Amino acid sequence: RNTETCQAACKGIEYVSHQAALGSVPRSIKEPVYFNEVNVGGFVNMLKASVDNAVKQFVYASSSSVYGDEPTLPKIEEKVGRCLSPYAATKKTNELFAQVFADVYGLKLLGFRYFNIFGPRQDPDGSYAAVIPLFVKGILKRSPVYINGDGEQTRDFTFVENAVQINIKGMLTSNEQALNKVYNVAVGDRFSVNYLYETCKSQLNSD
């Protein structure tokens, strides 16, 4: 959030990958002002610092949460609904600011809407409510695992290494037609919560 820190971070830098944000939906409901200050204020500071320091390309983390109450499946970038949390609103606002900085200041950007990132060393007790590490923790500790509803609700996912690769490709692309847009980053399929749990049990050789 500190302007001077953002300016110093971008000095002499050609490419920026902005992944920093507060990520808990429940916490955003309790602390909407703080989330706006960090997620939006910090993002705009980094955009301005990138312009001031002639950064070549800027990629950033958006979120599948911007789809809100839009029922269309599969999700397509052009169809978003009403945001359902302050966190989602900050991510949608970031996309709007990115478009403005592209149009007004000529900054080259790409945004990525991640779907449920998972991967090694993910903290099951962290603020990011990720179902896979919660399942793994429960199975390994042989503790109860709770599934809401009938477990047939579906989600899409993003392996963390794929998120890294899309950021690298986004920073380095020279395709002008690809710039100044947002993209879904996911497997491109739907997996039920029950399927995820059974797969985790199978992979961990648990009864």
Model-derived segments and spans:
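Serine-hydrolase catalytic-loop signature spanning alpha/beta hydrolases and amidase-signature enzymes
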Residues: 24-28
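Catalytic helix-loop patch of NAD(P)-dependent Rossmann-fold dehydrogenases
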Residues: 30-48, 52, 56-57, 66-111, ...
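Hydrophobic alpha-helix immediately C-terminal to the catalytic Tyr-X-X-X-Lys motif of short-chain
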Residues: 93, 97, 101, 131, ...
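Adenine-nucleotide cofactor-binding loop residues
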Residues: 1-2, 41, 118, 158
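Conserved NAD(P)H cofactor-binding loop of Rossmann-fold oxidoreductase domains
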Residues: 19-23, 62-63
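C-terminal substrate-binding subdomain of Rossmann-fold SDR/epimerase-dehydratase oxidoreductases
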Residues: 139-207
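Conserved Rossmann-fold cofactor-binding substructure of NAD(P)-dependent oxidoreductases
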Residues: 1-15
